[in-house]
C-alpha cells in the first residue's frame, strides 16, 4: 500500500519546507524508497526547485477542488512507495476540499498521515485541532520544530487536550532538530540537497552531517 505523508502546519513560518526536504532526503537515500513529491506550495516552490532533478516532482495547486482531483489522479497512477506532499501556508483548503481525496484513499491503494510542523504559538494547535476534528481517521504526528525552542518549551502542546486526542487517534509527536542558521542559509542560497553538503565549508559540513544523521534517526522509523 502506498504511504502518503502530508507535511502541513496550516500557516507559514513553521518550517514545513525544511522538514519536507529532510523527509525527502531520508526517504530517497537511507530508506531507499521510490518517492513522489507533490509540491503544493506553488507560489514559493523551494522544495521542487531543489529536488526536481533528483526525484519525481509534480506541482499541484491545492486551492480548489480541481487541485485535489488532480492530486487523487497523481496518487492513483503513481507506482511510488511514498508520496510526500509539501503544503503551502494556505493549507486550510484541506478543510474545504480534502474530503474528496481522503474519502477515496482505499481506491488509490493508499494510506495517509499528516506531519504537522509547528512552532510554539497557540494558533499552531488551533489549526491542527481543526484538521483533527474534520478528519479524525487520519493519523497526525505533531512535529515540534526546535528552531523555535527546545521541546520543553512547547508547553501549550504538552498540556493540551489535543495532544491526548492525537495520540488516542493513532498519531504521535516528533522533535525536529535545529540546524545552525549559517548552514541553512548556505543550503537555501545554493539550492543544495542534503546529499550535496560536501561542497560546504568544513564547519558547515559537520553541522549539516549532524543534522542529516539526526533526521535519519527521526524519520526512518516514521517511514516504516
Task: Place the predicted regions along the sequence by residue.
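Conserved beta-strand segments of the P-loop GTPase G domain that flank and frequently precede/overlap
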Residues: 38, 84-87, 113-119, 141-146
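Short acidic, S/G/P-rich loop/turn micro-motifs used as interaction or catalytic elements
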Residues: 14, 89-94, 120-124, 148-150
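Extreme N-terminal, non-catalytic leader segments
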Residues: 1-6, 73
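Beta-strand-loop-alpha "switch" segments that mediate conformational coupling across diverse proteins
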Residues: 146-213
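Conserved C-terminal guanine-recognition region of P-loop GTPase G domains, centered on the G4
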Residues: 102-106, 122-142
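Walker A/P-loop NTP-binding active-site region of P-loop NTPases
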Residues: 4-62
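Switch II (G3) loop of P-loop NTPases
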Residues: 81-98
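Inter-motif core of Ras-like GTPase G domains
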Residues: 97-121
Amino acid at each position: 500500500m502506498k504511504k502518503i505523508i502530508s507535511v502541513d502546519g496550516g500557516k507559514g513560518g513553521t518550517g514545513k519546507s525544511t522538514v519536507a526536504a529532510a523527509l525527502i532526503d531520508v526517504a530517497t537515500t537511507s530508506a531507499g524508497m521510490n518517492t513522489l513529491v507533490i509540491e503544493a506550495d506553488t507560489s514559493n516552490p523551494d522544495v521542487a526547485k531543489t529536488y526536481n532533478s533528483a526525484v519525481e516532482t509534480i506541482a499541484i495547486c491545492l486551492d480548489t477542488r480541481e487541485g485535489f482531483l488532480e492530486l487523487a489522479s497523481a496518487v492513483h497512477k503513481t507506482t511510488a512507495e511514498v508520496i510526500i506532499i509539501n503544503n503551502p501556508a494556505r493549507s486550510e483548503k484541506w478543510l474545504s476540499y480534502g474530503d474528496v481525496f481522503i474519502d477515496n484513499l482505499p481506491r488509490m491503494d493508499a494510506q495517509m498521515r499528516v506531519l504537522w510542523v509547528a512552532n510554539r504559538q497557540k494558533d499552531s494547535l488551533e489549526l491542527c485541532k481543526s484538521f483533527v476534528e474534520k478528519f479524525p481517521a487520519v493519523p497526525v504526528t505533531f512535529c515540534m520544530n526546535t528552531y523555535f525552542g527546545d521541546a520543553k518549551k512547547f508547553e501549550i502542546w504538552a498540556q493540551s487536550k489535543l495532544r491526548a486526542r492525537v495520540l488516542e487517534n493513532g498519531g504521535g509527536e516528533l522533535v525536529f532538530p535545529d540546524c545552525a542558521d549559517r548552514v541553512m542559509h548556505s543550503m537555501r542560497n545554493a539550492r543544495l540537497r542534503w546529499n550535496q553538503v560536501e561542497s560546504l565549508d568544513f564547519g558547515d559540513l559537520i553541522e549539516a552531517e549532524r543534522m542529516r544523521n539526526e533526521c535519519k534517526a527521526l524519520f526512518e522509523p516514521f517511514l516504516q
